[in-house]
A protein has these predicted regions:
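Acidic anion/phosphate-binding donor-loop and adjacent secondary structure
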Residues: 49-50, 85-101, 105
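Conserved donor-binding/catalytic core segment of Leloir-type glycosyltransferases
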Residues: 99-118, 124-127, 139, 237-238
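Short beta-strand->alpha-helix junction loop in the catalytic core
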Residues: 78, 82-93, 221-223
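Nucleotide-activated donor-binding/catalytic signature segment of Leloir-type glycosyltransferases, i.e.
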Residues: 142-168, 175
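Single conserved hydrophobic/aromatic residue that forms the stacking wall/gate
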Residues: 1-12
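Aromatic "clamp/platform" in nucleotide-sugar-dependent glycosyltransferases that forms part
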Residues: 181
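Short hydrophobic beta-strand element within catalytic cores of glycosyltransferases
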Residues: 198-201, 216
Length: 259
């Protein structure tokens, strides 16, 4: 938990997964502070009623974008949006190095976790199809290689790297790409934008409000399949999210590498 004190107002920044502890946190903080606010985010198109009830314990909930704010307002949560977000990489102000694109050797980059929401399995499956018999490369910087399709055109990096090394990957790539099903802040988009890289993704949810140009992948709003969602996240992933249309996304990537 991160906390910020302004006068008699306390604001905590906490991930939505910790909502079962919010009531105790608020009760303890109200012994010392007149106002207790929460800064958080969520990645789907709705919020579970149990989490809404916990949010209403705070005086105000602060979220990154209007898309999230509007959902909470419909549930009666007092809320405001920053319409801004950043990352430690961006805050470090790394040097942006211009790269001249080689159309015969394009480099695509995904930076993020490998889990059911991020949908990296579909991402690597698409690129294994599209990049076969080419010299183009997809770099996947992630936490684990589980169930990923790996070919000579797909490089998976799972070790921890510094912000300086991560900046080198962004400077090396020609495009940033993700097949994520849901997103609360859009870090890949914001970091790609910082490095002047085109972003390939769907355009749903918060992505509509990031202020970055997106090469759109076709997608559909779908019910969440909880088969591979850990038990502690089943209330966190609530409502619907967005699934990439795999066959039509293959066509989009093929068009990019043929231009």
């Amino acid at each position: 938990i991160d906390a910020c004190l302004v006068g008699s107002e306390m604001c905590i920044r906490d991930s939505i997964e910790t909502y079962p502890y919010w009531q105790k946190i608020v009760e303890e903080l109200r012994n010392d502070y007149d106002t207790v606010n929460l800064c958080t985010m969520f990645e789907t198109n709705d919020v579970h009623p149990d989490i809404i009830d916990k949010m209403k314990l705070f005086d105000e909930v602060i979220v990154p974008y209007d898309y999230l704010k509007d959902i909470l307002l419909k549930h009666g949560v007092k809320c405001k949006a920053l319409n801004y977000w950043t990352s430690s990489l961006i805050r470090s102000k790394p040097k942006v190095i211009h790269k001249t694109r080689d159309p015969s050797k394009l480099v695509f980059l995904y930076n993020g976790t490998n889990d059911i929401r991020k949908n990296v399995t579909t991402l690597t499956r698409i690129f294994a199809n599209v990049l076969e018999n080419t010299e183009h490369i997809l770099i996947v910087k992630t936490n684990k290689p589980d169930n990923l399709t790996i070919t000579k055109n797909i490089r998976v990096i799972t070790e921890r790297i510094s912000d300086e090394q991560l900046a080198s990957l962004f400077n090396l790539c020609d495009y940033c790409v993700t097949c994520t099903r849901g997103e609360g802040v859009g870090l890949l988009h914001l970091e790609g934008y910082y490095f002047n890289k085109p972003i390939i993704s769907h355009k749903q949810g918060v992505f509509k409000q990031l202020g970055v140009d997106i090469i759109p992948l076709p997608s559909n709003e779908v019910d969440i399949d909880y088969t591979h969602v850990p038990k502690f996240l089943k209330n966190v992933f609530y409502g619907k999210w967005w699934d990439i249309d795999e066959n039509n996304s293959i066509k989009v990537i093929k068009k990019i590498i043929s231009e």
